[in-house]
Amino acid sequence: MKVYQSKIKKLAGTDYKEIHSLAENLYKQIGTKTKRRPYARSAYFNKDKIFLDYFWRHLWQKNWRDRVRRLKYYPCALDLIKNSKTEPISKQNPNKSNEILHRFAGLSKDKELFFVQITEDKKTNQKSFLSVFPEQ
């Protein structure tokens, strides 16, 4: 599997409030550029929209330690979505038969491995940013 080298560092800090506010500010910056749902255009999917709001719903299902761990890689994940042309691992979602899961691998500027998951609806071809998490 090829890995995308990100040019952006992960968020620094250990406090949840600090990291959450930094990540949320990034999300709001993107949100102000769109009329409806915030999205990023993906280089791999031929500049298709990847909607970002589903990530936040998914994040609230995790405990606070896991949220911090995932939010640290949020800027790296956005960079990967926008610029990566590397082939992901794609498979059918075992929980929903009408979805495909795409898993991209990336390295932060600090050389730390992380993964980004994007779901694609087979009927509507709509793609959503589901999750970002480090290797461990």
Kindly label every feature range from the protein language model:
Residues M1-Q136:
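Ribonuclease/tRNase effector modules and their secretory precursors
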